[in-house]
């Protein structure tokens, strides 16, 4: 394979060392990896709001033992993992990409459909809308209707021998 392209996927994969080894094995020598995923700082405010709401009122019992669904790595850590997997000419950098919403309802719908699935599946159906609305309200306390994306961009070339 000459090129592997990925967007918004790597942060869902728990074992990045294995992932990068497999990608290096799939590429021809000098093949390129171009990817973007969530970084260590991705949705930090949003995750904080989720954690606060999970710990309030009737919600804690539903989230006992919940594992974080994301593997959000730092640029430096990702670079080291890629190099260890057989990539050279590795370039990793962060890009802030805040996503703004026009209304609290729009933000809550986005959270419910895009970000909170792993959390909502633990809740009774009757609690899901309320949970998403509470997370949205917690985010809005700073006067902004924003999800704070910080993307990790990756460019790498497979070394001749892996």
Language-model-detected regions and their locations in the chain:
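A short helix-coil junction within the Rossmann-fold of NAD(P)-dependent oxidoreductases
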Residues: 22-25, 158
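Conserved catalytic/acceptor-binding region of the Class I
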Residues: 17-18, 28-102
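A short, conserved alpha-helix within the catalytic core of class I
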Residues: 13-23
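Short catalytic micro-motifs in class I SAM-dependent methyltransferases
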Residues: 8-9
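A conserved beta-strand element that flanks and buttresses the S-adenosyl-L-methionine
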Residues: 5
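Conserved acidic residues
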Residues: 2
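Conserved Class I S-adenosyl-L-methionine
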Residues: 67-162
């Amino acid at each position: 394979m000459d090129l592997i392209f990925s967007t918004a996927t790597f942060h869902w994969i728990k074992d990045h060392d294995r992932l990068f080894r497999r990608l290096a094995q799939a590429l021809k020598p000098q093949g390129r990896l171009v990817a973007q995923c969530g970084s260590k700082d991705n949705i930090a405010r949003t995750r904080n709001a989720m954690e606060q709401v999970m710990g309030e009122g009737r919600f804690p019992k539903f989230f006992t033992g919940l594992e974080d669904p994301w593997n959000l790595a730092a640029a430096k850590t990702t670079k080291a993992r890629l190099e260890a997997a057989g990539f050279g000419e590795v370039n990793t950098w962060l890009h802030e990409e805040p996503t703004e919403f026009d209304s609290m309802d729009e933000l809550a719908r986005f959270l419910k459909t895009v970000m909170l699935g792993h959390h909502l599946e633990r809740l009774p159906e009757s609690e899901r809308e309320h949970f998403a609305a509470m997370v949205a309200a917690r985010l809005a306390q700073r006067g902004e209707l924003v999800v704070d994306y910080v993307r990790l961009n990756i460019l790498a070339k497979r070394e001749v021998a892996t």
